Amino acid sequence: MEGAGETTTSEGHLTSAAAFVEGGIQDACDDACSICLESFCESDPSTLTSCKHEYHLQCILEWCQRSSQCPMCWQSISLKDPTSQELLEAVEQERNFRFNPTRNATIFRHPTLGDFELQHLPVGVDNAEIEERIIQHLAAAAAMGRARHGVRREGHRSRSSSQGHQQFMVFSSQPNASSPPPHPPMPSSPSQRDESDTVSNLPHNALGEGSHQSNTQPPTSSHPRQVSPSASDSNSRPLNQSSPSEQDRAGPSELQSFSESLKSRLNAVSTRYKESISKNTRNWKDRLFSRNTSMADLGSEVKREVSAGIATVSRMMERLETRENSRPSTASVSDVSENHTPETNNEHNRAAAGDEHSVNERGVKETCATGSGSS
């Protein structure tokens, strides 16, 4: 039974939403928004209108981009919360600008966010009105971005890109300029934080004309919305530069201090790089010169070692040659000595025979002498 009750309730909500989209007057939902059919919560509370209907702030702001009447009773929409009413008025102004296009466009130059094109401004508008208009633009965009990317929209529904519409008419006059990041990095030192706060809080005073259009993002939104340019202002027009006196009004002392600090930092970095480069070149020169001297010393030592090695090798070769030459000479000497030994024996025998012959001759002579003496 409970499931059937929930089914009938959801079907009733869907039927109410379908009839509401078609334009019929329906009863308001008790605890849910009659536009998106989602319940109210602490992160996304309800916003009460003057006709006592409750909606999500984002839903009613998106509805007011198309219509100025309450979707439930078709009365003129006004919110009881003064802050929400200011946002609603800003959205209605943007809707009127889109429905009633004009050719007047004013260029606003911000030192941090770049150049912005503000359309539909009077000719004799002063700087205070320009600042108020810009604050309204950025506040409306921030509220829409936060509500669109809130917790209640995660995983519940997805809208096609064909149903998207323009949110606010703030365009950049520089097509190639990059938009500021949604989450700027926090400076590390207090001085850098002061400088960034000073630059972001400068007044918005510079004026000009032109209509180059590109997507830009508000810095105050944690989830910024992209802006689609209008087709009526697609033709380019010349850009008139503002006078120097009007540009000097945007905090000259802060700009000068910021530029001087940047120049000092750049000079310090450049001197550091120059010193490091000079040190590196000196080290390389010292290394090259030391390598040349060491190579010269090494060459002399190598030459000495090579000459000593050549001398030792030549000596060894000479020794080997002398040894090889001495071996055949000793062999010939031994052969000659062996050949001469029998000759010496023969000579010895001959000498012994000669001695015997001489002894025999002496004996014969003595006998002959004795014989002659006896006769």
Curated annotation (Swiss-Prot):
GO molecular function, one example? transferase activity
**Which transformation does this protein catalyse, written as a reaction?**
S-ubiquitinyl-[E2 ubiquitin-conjugating enzyme]-L-cysteine + [acceptor protein]-L-lysine = [E2 ubiquitin-conjugating enzyme]-L-cysteine + N(6)-ubiquitinyl-[acceptor protein]-L-lysine
Tell me the domain of life: Eukaryota
Ranges of Basic residues compositional bias?
A: 146-159
Under Pfam families, the record lists: zf-RING_2 (PF13639)
UniProt lists compositionally biased (Polar residues) regions at 211-245, 327-336
SMART domains annotated for this entry?
RING (SM00184)
Q: Where is this region: Disordered?
A: 146-165, 172-262, 318-375
Instruction: Quote the EC number.
Output: 2.3.2.27
Q: Where is the composition biased (Basic and acidic residues)?
A: 337-365
Describe which pathway this protein belongs to, using the record's wording.
Answer: Protein modification; protein ubiquitination
Protein task = E3 ubiquitin-protein ligase involved in the positive regulation of the gametogenesis progression. Required for the degradation of KRP6, a cyclin-dependent kinase inhibitor which accumulates during meiosis and blocks the progression of subsequent mitoses during gametophytes development. Functions in association with RHF1A.
What is this protein's name?
Answer: E3 ubiquitin-protein ligase RHF2A
**Native source species:** Arabidopsis thaliana (Mouse-ear cress)
